[in-house]
Amino acid sequence: MNLQDIAKIREVNPVVVNYANFVTPFLVANGLNAVGASPIMSDEVSEAEELVQLASAVVINAGASRKESWPLMNKLCEAANQYQKPLVLDPVAVGATQYRKALNLMLLEKYHFDVIRGNIGEIAVLAGIDWQTRGIDAGNGTGDMSAVVQACAQKFKNVVIASGEVDYISDGQQVITVHNNTKLLPAIVGSGDLLSSIVGAFSAVAENTLDAAVTASLVLSCAGERAAAQLDQQNRPGSFLSYLLDELANITPEQVQDLMKIGEA
């Protein structure tokens, strides 16, 4: 991990193309802008290849996709692989319906995703491991989270992030844990979507994908902790969101270094 990538993003301003979940584009766009990236979103298939060519990374959020949108998703993924741009998948609620499961497995079969970011329930579904999921929530599974994440990374030969109270991140060999957190982050609908897109931004500047995933996790969670501290940990999610964007825009490598709590599972 190289925390100087926090400053590098602000210098490079990588363009991140997002196939966005219609629930959260405001948060994702503003969060990406805050960390120093340049977000762009589109629902037009005819411009997909051109957008990917100018992009530094592509993020696919499968949370609210209609079959009519499959050609656009396919074109974005195809172009990302063709032009060797980092490609991130957020398989929102993949275990909730057969439709969502089929869509995500189709994408993973046809294209190589450098990173998959989901909650532990979503990651377990993709890995083929039983877990009690509940909609977009992780559910109450009792398995070994590090083993689930590692198995998924090995299956798809990429980096996998299971975000939650503790973030588990694996490249199939090692499992890194990030223990920074605040109860206010999950109170913001789309905080996971934002993390997926921030991973895309760091993938554009980091030396390797695992470093990008760990740094992105640390940046969002440490910014969240700093934002919550300004509210004295009160349950004020609306105010927290404003402070979170401020912290994402101003957090420094040194501040993350001082706050970070990482380990290996």
From Swiss-Prot:
Family, per entry: Belongs to the Thz kinase family.
Name recorded for this polypeptide: Hydroxyethylthiazole kinase
Taxonomy, superkingdom: Bacteria
Pfam families tied to this protein: HK
CC cofactor: Mg(2+)
InterPro entries the record matches: Hyethyz_kinase, Ribokinase-like
Entry coiled-coil feature ranges: none
Entry keyword set: ATP-binding, Kinase, Magnesium, Metal-binding, Nucleotide-binding, Thiamine biosynthesis, Transferase
Functional note: Catalyzes the phosphorylation of the hydroxyl group of 4-methyl-5-beta-hydroxyethylthiazole (THZ).
Residues that coordinate or bind ATP: R117, S163
GO molecular function, one term: ATP-dependent NAD(P)H-hydrate dehydratase activity
Binding site for substrate: M41, G190
Catalytic activity: 5-(2-hydroxyethyl)-4-methylthiazole + ATP = 4-methyl-5-(2-phosphooxyethyl)-thiazole + ADP + H(+)
Transmembrane segments: none
Gene that encodes it: thiM
Species the sequence originates in: Pediococcus pentosaceus (strain ATCC 25745 / CCUG 21536 / LMG 10740 / 183-1w)
